[in-house]
Amino acid sequence: LLGTKLLMAGHNVTLVCRKNTAELINRGGTEVRIKLRDEATHRAIFSRDLPGSLDAAAPADVEISRYDLVGLAMQEPQYTNHAIEVLMIRIAEARLPCLSIMNMPPLPYLRRIAALAEADLDEAYTNAAVWERFEPGLVTLCSPDPQAFRPPEEAANVLHVGLPTNFKAATFADAKHNALLRELEADIDAVRLDGLDVPVKLKVFDSLFVPLAKWSMLLTGNYRCITPHEPQSIRDAVHGDIRQSQAIYDHVDAIARKLGADAADQWPFAK
């Protein structure tokens, strides 16, 4: 989804995926289905119709020197795959800025928070060694992420956007990298489709704590979808006991404030 927004803004994107998926994307491109404001049905946006160029590659085939920015878009345990781990070493050595849309904040990002800089956090990660070469100031995080999924009946190059919210990114440590981030923000904001605004923007914030608004949402909703018996929807997880849900949400918000967040960085439970 983020790649498609960048393509719509005229930037070039490489998706790193399994070999078979890379071959599929290089052959047929991608399709992202998204609903525009006040429209009843989703529109299909095909990469082949966009001004930016898209290709895909397996981890071993990525040529690092081609890129200005890396997007980290997998679940945290997946970074322990050997081919991915080798690619991550190359990214860290190249000192490329990394924009994460992971649910689990990358360890170098948490090191940017003064209260966590010296904390022993390794056990929270499947393999913390994946992150040890990264300079903290080169890693930033987005929140809250739009909700999107691959329809199970479709090929792996199709994505359906269910909740078209914005990517809210904290800044990097380097002004040069922030200039790139704000350029992408402006370019994405300017995109129109048949004269209409396209949802899912990239918004840049100075506070490191804006992305941590995700914690309260995930722990109140998504992470309570798995029960001892059967899965439940996010709606049921939250509304099944609204008082308990608000208590969880407020508790996690309080932890973020204890780490240094301002209430203005957070997202009210009622919304």
Regions found by a protein language model. Name each.
Residues 30-55, 122-125:
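N-terminal glycine-rich dinucleotide-binding loop that anchors FAD/FMN and/or NAD(P) in oxidoreductases
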Residues 65, 94, 99-216, 220-221:
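Rossmann-fold dinucleotide-binding core
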Residues 180-195, 244-265:
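Flavin-binding catalytic cores
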Residues 1-34, 107:
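NAD(P)+-binding Rossmann beta1-loop-alpha1 motif at the extreme N-terminus of oxidoreductases
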Residues 20, 82, 175, 179, ...:
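Conserved active-site and cofactor/substrate-binding residues in soluble primary-metabolism enzymes
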Residues 208-228, 249, 253-271:
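C-terminal substrate-binding/catalytic lobe of Rossmann-fold NAD(P)-dependent oxidoreductases
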Residues 43-100:
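Rossmann-like NAD(P)-binding element
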Residues 166, 226-240:
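Short, flexible active-site loops
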